[in-house]
Amino acid sequence: MKRRAASPAMSENEVDIAGSLFANHADSDDEVQVHKQQPADLDFGDLLDNGDGSDDGGDAAFIAKQQRSSNRKTGSLQSKSAKKSGGFQAMGLNSNLLRAISRKGFSVPTPIQRKTIPLVLERRDVVGMARTGSGKTAAFVIPMIERLKAHSARVGARAIIMSPSRELALQTLKVVKELGKGTDLKTVLLVGGDSLEEQFGLMAANPDIIIATPGRFLHLKVEMSLNLSSVRYVVFDEADRLFEMGFAAQLTEILHALPPSRQTLLFSATLPSSLVEFARAGLQEPSLIRLDAETKVSPDLESAFFSVKGGEKEGALLHILHDVIKMPLGVPEGIEEETDEQQARKRKRDSERRNRKEKPTEHSTIIFTATKHHVEYIAHLLRHAGFSVSYIYGSLDQTARKIQVDNFRRGRTNILVVTDVAARGIDIPVLANVINYDFPPQPKIFVHRVGRTARAGQRGWAYALLQGTSRPCGGRVRRMRTQRWRMQTRMNQPLRKTKWTSSPEKTNPPGDDEEAWEDEESESELEVTVTSSGKSYQGANILPRPRNLHVLHTIAPPAPAEERGVRAFNSGGTTQFVEAARDAAMDLANDDGAKAFGLPTRSKLRWDKRHSKYVARANDDDGSRGAKMIRGESGVKIAASFQSGRFDKWRRANRLGRLPGVGEAEKANLVRNFSGGGPGGAGAGHYKHRQEKAPKDADKFRDDYHVRKKRVAEAREKRIGKYKDGEGSRRELKSATDIRKARQVQEQKREKNARPAKRAKR
C-alpha cells in the first residue's frame, strides 16, 4: 500500500504519529521532511510511554508546554488587535461605552484623546490645548461617563461642564446624549434665555451631569442656594473664551464653592497668561497636554515673504490671489447661489442633501488681519474684486459667525478673512494657503497661524506681507529658511539705477549677521523670500525665475519619523506645569479698537453724569454705576438680582416643602414630576402636557348628555379646572371684579348685536 502524502500544514497542537503506524517510517523519514516541518525534540511514543527521551517524563509537562505556547500566541494576537483597533479597547472602558463609541463612528482616537483619556481615568487634573474639531469634547465626555457609570439615587450633581456659549453647550449636550446611550445618567442644560422656573424643576429632579454657561449657573446657585459638595468632575470647555467674554468673576465664585477633592479639566485653544494663573489656583498638580504639531512649523510648509510699502499691500494681496494662488472668481464650481426667497422656503434637511460637500476647495485661503475694521475692509475689497469671501471677528454675532464659517467649510466661499481672536478654536480640516496681511508680533502667533495648513502630509503655502515696521519681526522667521529668492517688479526696474539703499543700522540691529542683499533692499522693491522645508512644491509657481536670481540653498536634515508625527507634551506637577505653560502661553491682542496690532487696547471710558468725569467701563459690574451688588462666598461682587426670591415663589406655587439635601435619598414623586420637562431633561426636546381643563357642561339636547353629566360630576369631585376652588364656575361667591367683567361682556354683546329692546305689548 502506497503511503499518502503528508498534509502541507500542521495544526498548532498536532503531533506526528506516522512512526507508530508505518513500519518503514525510518526509511521514508527524509521524504516526509521535504513536505512538512517536524516539531523539534518531540516524540509522541516517548511522551505516552514515559520514555527516556522526555526530560520531565509525564503528560502534565507536555500539556503545560502546549498551553504556555497557546497563551503566548493569544496574548500577542490580543496586543496586535488592540493596537490595530486604535486604543479605545486598550483604555479599559466598559463594553456599553465602547458600543456607544462605535455607534458614534469613532474608530481611532485623535491625538488629544489618546493623550488625555488615560490621564483623566487616573483622576489627574489636565490642561489640554486643542482647537475646535480635534475631538476634545469626546476627550472629557468618555472618561466622565466611564467614571459616573449610572444614575445615583443620592441627591447631588456629580459632574459640571462649563461652556462659553449656548451653541457650544447644545453641542456638548448632544455628544453626552449619544455617548451615554444605554445608561440612566440624567443630564440638564442650563443656559440663558430659558425659563428659570423650568430650570428650577430640572435641578430639583436630581441630575447627574450639568451643562451650563457660567452666568446662568451662578444665578441658579445663588437663587437656589445649591450645595456643590457632591461634585467630583468639573470641565471648563473653551476656557480662553470664558475669560474673554468676561466670566472671570463668575468662574472664581463657582470655583470657590466646589470641593477640593474634585477633578478639574481645562480645555483651551490658546493659553493666555490669565488662564495660567486660573489653572494654578484651581487645579492641583495639573498636566499640560499640547500637540507637537501646534508648536513647530510643519516640514511640508512652503513660506513666502513679500516686502512692500504700506500703499501697496492691497495690490500685493490681489497679486497673490490672482497670479500666485490662481484663485477663481465668483462662486466655486458646483455651488449654486440661492436667492433670499429660496433660503426662506427651503428646509434644513433639503439643504444638507443638496450640498454634501463638507470640506473647503483646493483654493481655500485664510487671511489674517489685525482688527475687525481691517476684516471688514479686506472682505469688502475682495468682494468688489469678484472673490467669494467669508469673514469673522471677535464681536460678530454668534449666528452670523456660524453662517460665515459654515459657508467656508462647505466650499461655498474660497477665502476666510479673520483676526487672531476670532480664528482661535476654529479648525479647518483642509487648508491650502495662509496669508498674513498684518504680520504677527510674536513668533508663537506666527506658528499658530501657519500651523493651519500643511497638515496630514499635505503641502501648504504661507504668505506674509512685510512693511518697514514689521520687517524686523519677519527677520526672526527668515532665519529658519533654506532658500531665499529676491526679485523686482517690472514697474520698478527702470528705477534700479536711481534707487537709494538703506543703511544696515536701520534694518538690522548691531551684530546681526545678515547678508548683503538685505542691506540693499528698498521700499520701492517687491522682495519675495521663499522658505522651503522639504521638496519643491510643484503646485504653486510664484514668479518666473530671473537670470540674476540669488539663491542660498541649505540642505536641512530630514526630520525623524517620530517628530513628523503628532506628539504631545505632558507635564506633571505644579513647577513643571508653570515651566511648560510659560512656553505655551500666548496673549492675543483684542481685535476691537486696538490702536495698533500687538499693542494693548486702551480702557474704554464713559461719561459719569453724577461725578462729571470719564470713568472706565470695566468697573460697571462692580456697583460703581449704581447697580445693586452683593458679596459672594469668594468675596467677589455679583449682581443682587441673583437673590430675587423667584425660587421660593416657584416652590410655594408647586406646593413643595423642603427639598432633599446633598447625600439624602431622592424623592420618586419629585423626580417624576419635574424630570424631562425642559430642553435638557430626560426627554430633551419634548415638553410634557400638564394643563388640566374641566369638561364642558352637559347639554340635555345631545345624545351623550348622560355621559357628559357623569364627567362633569367627576370633575367637580376631583376639583379639576374651573372646579378647582369648589362648586360653581370659579368660586361660589363672585367678587366685585368678576361682576364688573361680566357686565362689560354683556354690554359688548348687546352693542355687537345692536338690536333694540323688545317693547311690551299693550
From Swiss-Prot:
EC number, UniProt record: 3.6.4.13
Catalyses which reaction(s): ATP + H2O = ADP + phosphate + H(+)
Keyword Cytoplasm set for record: no
Keywords: ATP-binding, Helicase, Hydrolase, Nucleotide-binding, Nucleus, Ribosome biogenesis, RNA-binding, rRNA processing
GO cellular component, one term: nucleolus
UniProt biased composition (Low complexity): 41-50
Amino-acid positions noted as binding ATP in the UniProt annotation, renumbered to this chain: A130, R131, T132, G133, S134, G135, K136, T137
Subcellular location: Nucleus, Nucleolus
GO molecular function, one term: RNA binding
GO biological process, one term: rRNA processing
PROSITE patterns listed in its UniProt record: DEAD_ATP_HELICASE, HELICASE_ATP_BIND_1, HELICASE_CTER, Q_MOTIF
Locus of motif Q motif: 86-114
Family: Belongs to the DEAD box helicase family. DDX54/DBP10 subfamily.
Its biological purpose: ATP-binding RNA helicase involved in the biogenesis of 60S ribosomal subunits and is required for the normal formation of 25S and 5.8S rRNAs.
UniProt comment concerning the protein's domains: The Q motif is unique to and characteristic of the DEAD box family of RNA helicases and controls ATP binding and hydrolysis.
The name this protein goes by in its record: ATP-dependent RNA helicase DBP10
Organism of origin: Chaetomium globosum (strain ATCC 6205 / CBS 148.51 / DSM 1962 / NBRC 6347 / NRRL 1970) (Soil fungus)
